[in-house]
């Protein structure tokens, strides 16, 4: 993917364009993708199909932009601590937005929404905790690029499925549950991967997890609606994981 997609894109980007500008464009693309997924259940079948196809294009574009900004920075000798900070800092928002986009698009039950959303932000926070401790950014078994390719395919598939059949039919229901639980299974494996490398020393990580669990409980009890829960987890990730980014890069 890097060779066939990203490198040709990098070659045509003018040198005067800042890598941070590309990073900010990517943030806008992620927000657009989230909005399309969030509104899709309220749309007519054809409109829903178009919205999810648009979300798939946005997801795939974001995957390319996420690689292109760093490649462009190295190519034009514009690498900086600010660029590294901005990239990781915005990922604290991107990660929960991508995860919740899939959940909202699939209209998963509250229990599954909480499990998949919290596991996604837990992975990134644990990854940053390991980065802060060891000074090296360790990539999980399933990379972000691979996850985004899978998400793109799922968005396209879901668009077709929801166009052909109503969401709340037995077969479609099993498709949704299967997709959501498969996502949680792979995310749980990622959590285990980082916990093992942290040697299960989770002192700085545990408060973040407990705050997420508290928000999950409020959602299950009805005190937080679906969108409110997503916003709360995004804010938690932005503050908790963002603090790790700042502390690590400021060392």
Task: For the regions a language model picked out, list residue spans one by one.
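Membrane-embedded alpha-helical segments that form the functional core of polytopic membrane enzymes
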Residues: 23-82, 98-102, 110-121, 172-180
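Juxtamembrane helix-capping/reentrant segments at transmembrane boundaries
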Residues: 11, 69, 73, 77-90, ...
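C-terminal membrane-associated helical module and adjoining short loops/tails
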Residues: 1-16, 120-251
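Membrane-interface helix starts
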Residues: 15-25
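Membrane-embedded alpha-helical segments in integral membrane proteins
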Residues: 31-40, 96-100, 156-160, 213-219
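Short hydrophobic alpha-helical membrane-embedded segments
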Residues: 24-27, 89-96, 202-212
């Amino acid at each position: 993917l890097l060779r066939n997609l990203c490198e040709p894109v990098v070659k045509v980007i003018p040198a005067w364009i800042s890598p941070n500008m590309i990073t900010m464009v990517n943030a806008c693309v992620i927000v657009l993708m989230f909005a399309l997924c969030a509104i899709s259940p309220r749309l007519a079948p054809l409109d829903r199909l178009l919205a999810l196809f648009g979300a798939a294009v946005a997801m795939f574009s974001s995957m390319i932009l996420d690689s292109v900004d760093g490649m462009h920075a190295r190519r034009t000798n514009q690498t900086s601590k600010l660029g590294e900070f901005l990239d990781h800092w915005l990922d604290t928002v991107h990660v929960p937005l991508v995860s919740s986009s899939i959940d909202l698009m699939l209209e998963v039950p509250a229990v599954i929404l909480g499990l998949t959303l919290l596991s996604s932000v837990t992975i990134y926070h644990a990854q940053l905790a390991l980065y802060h401790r060891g000074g090296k950014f360790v990539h999980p078994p399933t990379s972000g690029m691979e996850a985004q390719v899978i998400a793109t395919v799922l968005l396209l598939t879901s668009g077709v499925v929801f166009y052909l059949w109503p969401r709340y039919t037995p077969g479609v229901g099993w498709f949704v549950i299967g997709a959501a639980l498969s996502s949680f299974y792979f995310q749980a494996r990622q959590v285990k991967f980082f916990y093992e490398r942290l040697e299960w020393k989770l002192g700085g990580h545990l408060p973040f997890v407990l705050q997420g669990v508290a928000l999950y409980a409020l959602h299950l009890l009805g005190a937080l609606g679906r969108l409110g829960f997503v916003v709360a987890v995004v804010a938690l990730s932005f503050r908790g994981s963002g603090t790790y980014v700042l502390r690590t890069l400021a060392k």
